[in-house]
Amino acid sequence: MQIIRHSEQTLKTALISKNPVLVSQYEKLNAGEQRLMNEAFQPASDLFGPITLHSPSDWITSHPEAPQDFEQFFSDPYRKTPSPNKRSIYIQSIGSLGNTRIISEEYIKWLTGYCKAYFYGLRVKLLEPVPVSVTRCSFRVNENTHNLQIHAGDILKFLKKKKPEDAFCVVGITMIDLYPRDSWNFVFGQASLTDGVGIFSFARYGSDFYSMHYKGKVKKLKKTSSSDYSIFDNYYIPEITSVLLLRSCKTLTHEIGHIFGLRHCQWLACLMQGSNHLEEADRRPLNLCPICLHKLQCAVGFSIVERYKALVRWIDDESSDTPGATPEHSHEDNGNLPKPVEAFKEWKEWIIKCLAVLQK
């Protein structure tokens, strides 16, 4: 295992900058927010640790990239920021997300509620679900895993055409595996920062995807018209478990982070680290490191305390899609289907530690 450990000064500069204007901006944050973010360059911090690499196939090793500090993020001329007229994140589901209509509807509510808390202060809206056929995307059977895949680039074009006027971004979610080009095996997600659209698949997050008995395998793609999407009818959908929900929330917020202009994090263990495979994605935490949190706060303008409180409410309210909704209201809405949040409990404990630092 390799540990990527930066000096205190390097992390401090990455977080605050040496630009007097940005230093002054940082000093205007309240004392609690500065105290939490300063944990970035405290060697003994138990809240934020270094990045660990476990194999040569990990993202940083196999995809060398220049790191992005706060000043580079702030100065990026191509970075998009929500405006008063474009403060909505739209979610578009493609194909079924659950084995029943109720499960599918509840799952997307859970994801919507999580996004509302994670990108606190922005509106999160749902577009009407569509079958794969409506997108007119290319598709194939993966030669290695023998499962159906849809072309990510084609989906991005579809989402761009559907983007509402008040949208900051539109994100597509699907339980069907994605591929970005013929030479690639798969991709978890893909986003276009310029167009403000992204597509993310949760197909590989089911517990059985890599097993010999995976039910989504297709023996052979029949030589039919490229416009015949009937192969997707009743296609296999994994069970919505707590681990699958956690993995879905990670991917969704990571990719939306890219649309805000956050590049892959190379400073500390962080949600915005790249991931090349499922084991690495599981290692990646749900939280943003202080440097990436500073970037997102700059873009959205939230109170860090209120954002963390909203995330705790989402975890505590095991049946609601809305942070802070009453149990009675949500109980009525979802037909008693509990939100599987067991996998989030450890993160809740971490957030509570952060709130203690913020509210000293």
Curated annotation (Swiss-Prot):
InterPro entries: Archaemetzincin (IPR052009), MetalloPept_cat_dom_sf (IPR024079), Pept_M54_archaemetzincn (IPR012962). Binds 2 Zn(2+) ions per subunit. One is catalytic, whereas the other seems to have a structural role. Its cofactor is Zn(2+). GO terms for biological process: proteolysis. It comes from the Eukaryota. Its EC number is 3.4.-.-. Pfam families: Peptidase_M54 (PF07998). Zn(2+) 2 binds at C265, C270, C289, C292. The active site is at E255 (proton acceptor). One of its GO terms (molecular function) is metal ion binding. It is an enzyme of class 3 (hydrolase). SUPFAM superfamilies: Metalloproteases ('zincins'), catalytic domain. Down-regulated in testis from patients with maturation arrest (MA) or Sertoli cell-only syndrome (SCOS). Zn(2+) 1 binds at H254, H258, H264. Keywords: Hydrolase, Metal-binding, Metalloprotease, Protease, Zinc. CDD domains: Peptidase_M54. Belongs to the peptidase M54 family. Probable zinc metalloprotease. This is Archaemetzincin-2. It comes from Homo sapiens. The gene is AMZ2.
